[in-house]
């Protein structure tokens, strides 16, 4: 057996040990690293194809984060008892890992690269997201794959007014910030964050502090490379035929400039495609038939390079964008609310040629989404789904399950609004938002944020403040010049160097996502992007407030009504009943949906108030505890010479002594009440030892309160002894008279076996 060489490096990060190890596992992968932080342990493997895929003109990188149930000591609960399709969390971590790695591969490198991250152990304290980025970067660095890493990643929180590095998972719930930053030693590559209205300065400081820790993690990866790194495989970037570009540029003259400066996307694309077809036809006309295909690719690539240069140079040199806007100008905005009948809330937000319809649906607490990530069962009362159909960009594409992009954009919009949602105790509804992108020319995710805020207010959801979002772009030049663009459209996104999305209220930032296509950006660029984004966000909020500035005072007539009551925890079983029989009966009788929390809160969801009141009455009847001074409409269930027994609650009787039946003296109980009568009675005493209840009809008739009775010296009559009830209903003296005198020598007869 060949002895393995195992290499390991460690460093203290935020009081916990980060360890990177290579050589123990997956020796046939091009690179494999186990990253451990606390007891969270991940294996990252990377494999690169030996040759570029034929006909590929893009970099085919795939990142898969594989959740394994054994990592938390669980067996999958499905029929096959094995892991299935990736969860939303797995997809989001895959995207989180992909984004900072992709810019660091060389341009023109078209070999397929696959990164697989497998969860070995999850300790429920240390978030595996940043660790996945670190593990993947380390595996790429020690491999022979061309990669300009390493990349460090860290999570930042904001607790007790202080920034915290790598807060534990249970601390995130109390943190005003959940931010992941990734970068090289020289620059920031990626930021993803949700926040509770932090200022731009606070957000930037979190990025700066996080990047400082990223540098330490990069140093650790470099130590591992020195121990076991492989020489990088040779790669020569494709040679650019500048002479062909010059020839095409000269032949087109200013036609390309005129084509790309059309403000309408469809017209711009049509003119650009027509010009490209002319260029291809002209520059392939003299080629032999067998060379036409290759020549067409070369001409197409040269044309697209000229198109990119035209757009970028116009911005850098002239400050002119393709649609004629200034660098900090936002496209025309139009807003409508309440556009869809019968739904609980709706809004259409249109910015330029990007249009998003967002629908709000309110449901009961039982409609919460059950989430089971690696055995951690939680529920979500707020859900946001983002749909990007092919017609939104004028394309034909198969419609199937949501793509990773759709899930990622929905998650960004979801976390951008989370900070302004009402507390569950004030608004117990489950909230589902669906953003339908009807037309897209860039920044559809931020349009979803705006549409969602408007739709929530239209639905009457008491959000704390309106939220708007805007996407910023960046154009850089080889001479160090750069320009930040506000509200980028599709072409600027595709040909630019950065996508910097910021969402928030007038007070502060609630959501942030930054992706770049270069090898990093500086703090100065980020500071400028934050400043322009704030100005743009406030402008959009003003436009939104012109249409609807606060939540509607009432919910839609089509929305369900939820009422909340509190019952004693020890009464939950009584409400549910054997096998759920009792609660099912209430639901069937009233048409209500009833959800019970472990702390005794009961949510009654009904289509109207009458059904809710009926359900509450039935629940209170089952769970209410009698108290001194309470008045009940009770039913007489038993009559005795000394008084009447009255049922006041299900399974709960009290006794009205003959002296408490009326204001005047009562000689015979049946002169006042009969079996089955319903009478109003007041609880005047509850025996602390036995729990037996004494009732008074007289107190109700006279209007006396327990305090007045006590002050007047009235005391509850002593209850009869136990043997006077049950099987021996008659008083002892009456029983003795009926039985007659006992004869001497009488003894109880022993029971026979067949009695």
From Swiss-Prot:
<comment type="function">
    <text>Involved in mRNA degradation. Catalyzes the phosphorolysis of single-stranded polyribonucleotides processively in the 3'- to 5'-direction.</text>
</comment>
<keyword id="KW-0460">Magnesium</keyword>
<dbReference type="InterPro" id="IPR015848">
    <property type="entry name" value="PNPase_PH_RNA-bd_bac/org-type"/>
</dbReference>
<dbReference type="GO" id="GO:0000287">
    <property type="term" value="F:magnesium ion binding"/>
</dbReference>
<keyword id="KW-0479">Metal-binding</keyword>
<feature type="region of interest" description="Disordered">
    <location>
        <begin position="699"/>
        <end position="755"/>
    </location>
</feature>
<dbReference type="InterPro" id="IPR036345">
    <property type="entry name" value="ExoRNase_PH_dom2_sf"/>
</dbReference>
<keyword id="KW-0963">Cytoplasm</keyword>
<dbReference type="InterPro" id="IPR036612">
    <property type="entry name" value="KH_dom_type_1_sf"/>
</dbReference>
<comment type="similarity">
    <text>Belongs to the polyribonucleotide nucleotidyltransferase family.</text>
</comment>
<dbReference type="GO" id="GO:0006401">
    <property type="term" value="P:RNA catabolic process"/>
</dbReference>
<dbReference type="InterPro" id="IPR027408">
    <property type="entry name" value="PNPase/RNase_PH_dom_sf"/>
</dbReference>
<dbReference type="Pfam" id="PF03726">
    <property type="entry name" value="PNPase"/>
</dbReference>
<dbReference type="InterPro" id="IPR003029">
    <property type="entry name" value="S1_domain"/>
</dbReference>
<dbReference type="Pfam" id="PF00013">
    <property type="entry name" value="KH_1"/>
</dbReference>
<keyword id="KW-0808">Transferase</keyword>
<feature type="domain" description="S1 motif">
    <location>
        <begin position="629"/>
        <end position="698"/>
    </location>
</feature>
<dbReference type="InterPro" id="IPR020568">
    <property type="entry name" value="Ribosomal_Su5_D2-typ_SF"/>
</dbReference>
<dbReference type="InterPro" id="IPR036456">
    <property type="entry name" value="PNPase_PH_RNA-bd_sf"/>
</dbReference>
<dbReference type="Pfam" id="PF00575">
    <property type="entry name" value="S1"/>
</dbReference>
<feature type="binding site">
    <location>
        <position position="499"/>
    </location>
    <ligand>
        <name>Mg(2+)</name>
    </ligand>
</feature>
<dbReference type="GO" id="GO:0003723">
    <property type="term" value="F:RNA binding"/>
</dbReference>
<protein>
    <recommendedName>
        <fullName>Polyribonucleotide nucleotidyltransferase</fullName>
        <ecNumber>2.7.7.8</ecNumber>
    </recommendedName>
</protein>
<feature type="binding site">
    <location>
        <position position="493"/>
    </location>
    <ligand>
        <name>Mg(2+)</name>
    </ligand>
</feature>
<dbReference type="InterPro" id="IPR004088">
    <property type="entry name" value="KH_dom_type_1"/>
</dbReference>
<dbReference type="InterPro" id="IPR015847">
    <property type="entry name" value="ExoRNase_PH_dom2"/>
</dbReference>
<dbReference type="InterPro" id="IPR012162">
    <property type="entry name" value="PNPase"/>
</dbReference>
<keyword id="KW-0548">Nucleotidyltransferase</keyword>
<feature type="domain" description="KH">
    <location>
        <begin position="560"/>
        <end position="619"/>
    </location>
</feature>
<dbReference type="GO" id="GO:0005829">
    <property type="term" value="C:cytosol"/>
</dbReference>
<dbReference type="GO" id="GO:0000175">
    <property type="term" value="F:3'-5'-RNA exonuclease activity"/>
</dbReference>
<dbReference type="InterPro" id="IPR004087">
    <property type="entry name" value="KH_dom"/>
</dbReference>
<feature type="compositionally biased region" description="Basic and acidic residues">
    <location>
        <begin position="719"/>
        <end position="755"/>
    </location>
</feature>
<dbReference type="GO" id="GO:0004654">
    <property type="term" value="F:polyribonucleotide nucleotidyltransferase activity"/>
</dbReference>
<dbReference type="InterPro" id="IPR012340">
    <property type="entry name" value="NA-bd_OB-fold"/>
</dbReference>
<dbReference type="Pfam" id="PF01138">
    <property type="entry name" value="RNase_PH"/>
</dbReference>
<dbReference type="GO" id="GO:0006402">
    <property type="term" value="P:mRNA catabolic process"/>
</dbReference>
<keyword id="KW-0694">RNA-binding</keyword>
<dbReference type="GO" id="GO:0006396">
    <property type="term" value="P:RNA processing"/>
</dbReference>
<dbReference type="Pfam" id="PF03725">
    <property type="entry name" value="RNase_PH_C"/>
</dbReference>
<dbReference type="InterPro" id="IPR001247">
    <property type="entry name" value="ExoRNase_PH_dom1"/>
</dbReference>
């Amino acid at each position: 057996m060949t002895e393995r060489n195992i290499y390991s490096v460690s460093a203290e990060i935020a009081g916990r040990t980060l360890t990177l190890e290579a050589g123990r596992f997956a020796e046939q992968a091009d690179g494999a690293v186990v990253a451990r932080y606390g007891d969270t342990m991940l294996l990252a493997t990377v494999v690169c194809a030996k040759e570029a895929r034929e006909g590929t003109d893009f970099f085919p990188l795939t990142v898969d984060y594989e959740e394994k149930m054994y990592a938390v000591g669980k067996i999958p609960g499905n029929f096959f008892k094995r892991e299935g399709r990736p969860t939303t969390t797995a997809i989001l971590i895959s995207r989180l890992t992909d984004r900072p790695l992709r810019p660091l591969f060389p341009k023109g490198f078209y070999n397929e690269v696959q990164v697989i991250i497998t969860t070995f152990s999850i300790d429920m304290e240390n978030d595996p997201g940043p660790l996945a980025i670190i593990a993947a970067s380390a595996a790429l660095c020690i491999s022979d794959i061309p990669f300009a890493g390493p990349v460090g990643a860290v999570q930042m929180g904001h607790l007790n007014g202080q920034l915290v590095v790598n807060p534990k998972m249970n601390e995130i719930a109390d943190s005003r910030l959940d931010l992941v930053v990734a970068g090289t030693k020289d620059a920031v590559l990626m930021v993803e964050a949700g926040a509770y209205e932090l200022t731009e300065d606070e957000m930037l400081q979190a990025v700066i502090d996080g990047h400082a820790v990223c540098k330490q993690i990069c140093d650790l990866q470099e130590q591992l490379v020195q121990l076991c790194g492989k020489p990088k495989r040779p790669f020569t970037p494709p040679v650019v035929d500048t002479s062909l570009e010059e020839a095409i540029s000269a032949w087109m003259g200013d036609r390309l400039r005129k084509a790309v400066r059309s403000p309408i996307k469809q017209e711009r694309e049509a003119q650009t495609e027509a010009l490209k077809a002319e260029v291809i036809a002209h520059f392939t006309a003299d080629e032999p038939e067998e060379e036409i295909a290759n020549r067409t690719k070369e001409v197409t690539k040269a044309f697209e390079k000229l198109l990119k240069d035209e757009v970028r140079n116009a911005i850098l040199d002239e400050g002119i964008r393709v649609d004629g806007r200034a660098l900090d100008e936002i496209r025309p905005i139009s807003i409508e609310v309440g556009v869809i009948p019968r739904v609980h809330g709706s809004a259409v937000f249109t910015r330029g040629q990007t249009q998003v319809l967002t629908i709000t649906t309110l449901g009961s607490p039982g409609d919460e989404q059950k989430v089971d990530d690696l055995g951690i069962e939680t529920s979500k009362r707020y859900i946001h789904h983002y749909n990007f159909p092919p017609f939104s960009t004028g394309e034909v594409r198969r419609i199937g399950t949501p793509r990773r992009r759709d899930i990622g954009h929905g998650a960004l919009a979801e976390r951008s609004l989370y900070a302004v949602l009402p507390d569950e105790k004030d608004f117990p509804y489950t909230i589902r938002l669906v953003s339908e992108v009807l037309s897209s020319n860039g920044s559809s995710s931020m349009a979803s944020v705006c549409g969602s805020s408007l739709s929530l207010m239209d639905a009457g959801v008491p959000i704390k403040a309106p939220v708007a979002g805007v996407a910023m772009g960046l154009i850089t030049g080889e001479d160090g010049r750069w320009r930040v663009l506000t509200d980028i459209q599709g072409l600027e996104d595709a040909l630019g160097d950065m996508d910097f999305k910021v969402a928030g209220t007038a007070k502060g930032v609630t959501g942030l996502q930054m992706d770049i296509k270069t090898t990093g950006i500086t703090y100065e660029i980020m500071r400028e992007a934050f400043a322009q984004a704030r100005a743009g966000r406030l402008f959009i909020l003003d436009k939104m407030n012109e249409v609807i500035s606060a939540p509607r005072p009432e919910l839609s007539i089509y929305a369900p009504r939820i009422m909340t009551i509190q019952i004693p925890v020890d009464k939950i079983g009584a409400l549910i009943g054997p096998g759920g029989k009792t609660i099912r009966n209430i639901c069937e009788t009233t048409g209500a949906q009833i959800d019970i929390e472990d702390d005794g809160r009961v949510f009654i969801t009904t289509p109207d108030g009458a059904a809710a009141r009926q359900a509450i009455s039935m629940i209170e009847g089952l769970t209410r505890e009698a108290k001194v001074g309470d008045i009940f409409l009770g039913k007489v269930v038993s009559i005795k010479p000394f008084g009447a027994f009255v049922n006041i609650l299900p399974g709960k009787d009290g006794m009205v002594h003959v002296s408490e039946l009326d204001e005047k003296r009562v000689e015979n109980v049946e002169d006042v009440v009969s079996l089955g009568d319903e009478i109003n009675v007041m609880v005047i005493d509850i025996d602390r030892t036995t729990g037996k209840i004494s009732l008074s009809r007289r107190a109700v008739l006279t209007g006396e309160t327990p305090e007045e009775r006590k002050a007047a010296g009235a005391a509850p009559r002593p209850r009869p002894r136990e043997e006077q009830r049950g099987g021996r209903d008659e008083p002892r003296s009456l029983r003795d008279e009926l039985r007659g005198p006992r004869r001497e020598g009488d003894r109880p007869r022993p029971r026979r076996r067949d009695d």
